[in-house]
Amino acid sequence: MPSQKIRIRLKAYDHKLLDVSVGEIVDTAKRTGARVAGPIPLPTVVNKYCVLRGPHVDKKSREQFEIRTHKRLIDILEPTQQTVDALMKLDLSAGVDVEIKL
């Protein structure tokens, strides 16, 4: 597997949880002898929702909510078989979405 690279893309609503998970992945990859590029912070997506406060009549009274999706990108260059096995066994937090491309 010397000419391949693994691209890992992580998404989460909580940036602290995301950074902890990224740290675990980077430590695991470096321990097994692979080169790591990243973590690269990708743009944060902000979804804003505007909701009427009351059930009827008052259109001018509104409440605004937003949800932020934080993203990180990690490239693992020259992964070994040990790296792949260690990443498969890694247990990350429930609030982090992980996409892996070979």
From Swiss-Prot:
Please report any disulfide bonds recorded for this protein chain, giving both cysteine positions: none
List the GO terms this entry assigns under cellular component, sorted alphabetically: ribonucleoprotein complex; ribosome
- Which keywords does this Swiss-Prot/TrEMBL entry list? Ribonucleoprotein, Ribosomal protein
Per the UniProt entry, what are the Gene Ontology biological process annotations, in alphabetical order?
A: translation
Q: Name one GO molecular function term.
A: structural constituent of ribosome
Q: Which Gene3D superfamilies match?
A: Ribosomal protein S10 domain
Q: Which PANTHER family match?
A: 30S RIBOSOMAL PROTEIN S10 FAMILY MEMBER (PTHR11700)
Q: Give the matching HAMAP family.
A: Ribosomal_uS10 (MF_00508)
Give the record's subunit note. Answer: Part of the 30S ribosomal subunit.
**What's this chain's function?**
Involved in the binding of tRNA to the ribosomes.
Q: Which family does it belong to?
A: Belongs to the universal ribosomal protein uS10 family.
Protein name per the record: Small ribosomal subunit protein uS10
